[in-house]
């Protein structure tokens, strides 16, 4: 099931200013190899959110080739700390190259391994935590992330409508993870959540 009409997606992408060479190269690389990335429409939205809350400490749970990392790091600006995480050393190596070429290596910490384990090993609170790991892990990510977001900060999550599978039985483990995550964010007294039907569904949750 398509969450949005493909022609609408095309229309929105056509409206966007051209990305720089690095981001356009990453988009082509991801498309050729079927690597999921947030894409330019959500990338710009993520950039805007980072600027709106003046985020300086951001933890990404799952970063793949670093496409979202670059959008975040550019928005956060100098002096920020953005944590990149991925369990695939090859993806992390490629991401590092892209991040260096994008001019934001000074503010990105590259961590390789299980994202939730790495998160548990990283002290401190965060302005934004962005969840884009395996969907079975979303409920655990919720439980670990919410206590460590500062008041007024954001919990963000991609793929929360999961290609429409949230309304279609039978439901596999990934879909059940998304369903539970969505239930948790809307029942939490600590968050004010909104799910936007953009691309594959994007959750924006303000920490109260």
What is each stretch, according to the model?
Residues 1-128, 135-156, 160-208:
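A short alpha-helical cap/connector motif
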